[in-house]
Amino acid sequence: MSIEQYQRTVNALDKDIADLEKKKAALDKKAAEEQRKAANITINKNASTATVRSKLQQRDNYLTAANKAFGESATLANKIADKRKKRNAAAVHLQKEE
């Protein structure tokens, strides 16, 4: 491959990594927000059984959403790591060509 091809590869991988990191940050923020919402649910001691069930269900829904976001974030972290490996390999080839 030529120097230009390696440079294009490195640039494309840099862009992909930046995009994935942006998505990961958004998912991390969403997960933290869902956990905060779950933690802020309060149940009065005088609440009816139906209210208690409703609040617990609401808390479970928030925690499920947080766990889903954490899982998606972990998947993106793996993709970022793979892209970084490819980018580093392309950068090494580029340095050898120069």
Give the positions of each predicted feature.
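Residue-level detector of intrinsically disordered, flexible termini
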Residues: 1, 46-49, 65-68, 76, ...
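Short, charge/polar-rich alpha-helical segments
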Residues: 1-29, 68-74, 78
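General helical secondary-structure elements
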Residues: 4, 19-20, 32, 49, ...
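Long, charged amphipathic alpha-helices with heptad-repeat/coiled-coil character
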Residues: 10, 70-98
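General helical structural elements
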Residues: 12, 28, 63, 88-91
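Extended alpha-helical coiled-coil "stalk/arm" regions
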Residues: 23-59
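Extended, low-aromatic, Leu/Ala- and acidic/polar-enriched alpha-helical coiled-coil segments
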Residues: 56, 60-63, 67-70
